[in-house]
From Swiss-Prot:
Subcellular location: Membrane
Chain segments annotated as transmembrane: 44-64, 120-140, 153-173, 176-196, 215-235, 251-271, 301-321
Purpose of the protein: Facilitative glucose transporter.
Protein name: Glucose transporter 2C
Family that this chain belongs to: Belongs to the major facilitator superfamily. Sugar transporter (TC 2.A.1.1) family.
Ranges of the Cytoplasmic topological domain: 1-43, 141-152, 197-214, 272-300
Source organism phylogeny: Eukaryota, Discoba, Euglenozoa, Kinetoplastea, Metakinetoplastina
Keywords: Glycoprotein, Membrane, Sugar transport, Transmembrane, Transmembrane helix, Transport
Length: 337
């Protein structure tokens, strides 16, 4: 009987463990709780802005090709509306180019060289943000150490707003190099974003939700790319070639999405709570509390750095950026409308 009592007396202990764990689990915040959304918002805004900026190039190039293809516009009103893109209404009652077409062109259309950007300009435009992102990712670590995550978000927000303003200026003046300057500046900001968004979540998300919050950045990058593509489809298919096509308005409307996301990034930085982890050094460069940025030497970080570089390099070698930037041209050359 004593043996039985001992067995029974141990039963509550066996039951208490799981109950305690369940109780602890119940006290953790839900995914849609304000506590978790306050952390996850950086992934949502940062990922969407990053994705939209990736999808920006293909749509902008497509719209520019439409705006500079003067032969598409069938009336005087429509032709005059795209006069800033090199079109004019001729005495022959057709909309054509102000510049003389290349009579030595090997293409079917001798004015083909006047439609859209040249191969060189398209390459510069497509690579501008990539160059900026490379610079931004390099300086991100120093930026975080100097300013912390919260101020880094604010700085990125300001840079993104300025870059978006340059996009609108480029549309108004039809200045290619202003557009490229905006893309480089946006790239620098996004290079930092790709570092600070996952880092903020890693440091502040509840352990139960850290993995779910962690994947949101990539999810919303994909959403941003899809958003840009859907807007491009709508803007392209709704052009009225018989009346005022309002191409400048379409460019401004498309760029306005980037502007809204940039302002959202700035506001996120302004109202974001400070990270629970901080980097702190005294005047001699030694840690005086918080996390020590010199805790690990280069030798210890070499393998993780190598793995990160190989993973990122493999992703780029798939050609995803080339496909995203030149998707309309690729499908056009394949005979797909």
């Amino acid at each position: 009987m004593t043996e039985r009592r001992d067995n029974v007396s141990h039963a509550p202990d066996a039951i208490e463990g799981p109950n305690d764990g369940a109780h602890a689990e119940d006290t953790s915040p839900g995914f849609f709780s304000l506590e978790n959304l306050g952390v996850a918002q950086v992934q949502v805004v940062g990922g969407t802005l990053n994705g939209f900026s990736i999808g920006f190039v293909a749509v902008y190039i497509l719209l520019y090709e439409v705006a500079t293809n003067c032969s598409l516009f069938k009336t005087t009103e429509a032709c005059k509306a795209v006069g800033s893109y090199g079109c004019e209404w001729k005495d022959t009652e057709v909309c054509s180019w102000k510049k003389e077409c290349d009579s030595d062109s090997d293409g079917v259309n001798p004015c083909e060289s006047l439609i859209g950007y040249s191969s060189l300009y398209s390459g510069i435009f497509a690579s501008a943000m990539i160059v900026g992102s490379m610079v931004g990712s390099i300086i991100a670590g120093k930026c975080i150490t100097m300013f912390g995550l919260k101020k880094s978000f604010i700085i990125v927000g300001v840079m993104s707003v300025v870059a978006s303003a340059l996009n609108h200026i480029s549309v108004a003046t039809n200045e290619f190099w202003v557009l490229c300057a905006g893309r480089v500046l946006m790239g620098i900001g996004l290079g930092v974003v790709c570092v600070i968004c996952p880092m903020y979540v890693n440091e502040n998300a509840h352990p139960k939700l850290s993995k779910v919050d962690g994947v949101l950045f990539q999810v919303f990058i994909t959403f941003g790319i899809m958003l840009a593509a859907m807007l491009g489809l709508i803007l392209d298919k709704t052009v009225n070639y018989d009346n005022d096509p309002d191409m400048a308005g379409r460019f401004h409307g498309f760029c306005a999405v980037s502007s809204v996301l940039s302002v959202a990034m700035f506001l996120v930085g302004m109202f974001l709570r400070e990270s629970t982890a901080t980097f702190s050094q005294d005047d001699d460069g030694k840690a005086d509390g918080g996390m020590d940025p010199n805790e690990y030497g280069w030798g210890q970080m070499l393998w993780p750095l190598f793995m990160g570089a190989v993973t990122a390099g493999t992703l780029q070698l798939t050609g995803i950026n080339a496909v995203m930037n030149y998707a309309p041209k690729i499908t056009e050359n394949l005979g797909m409308d």
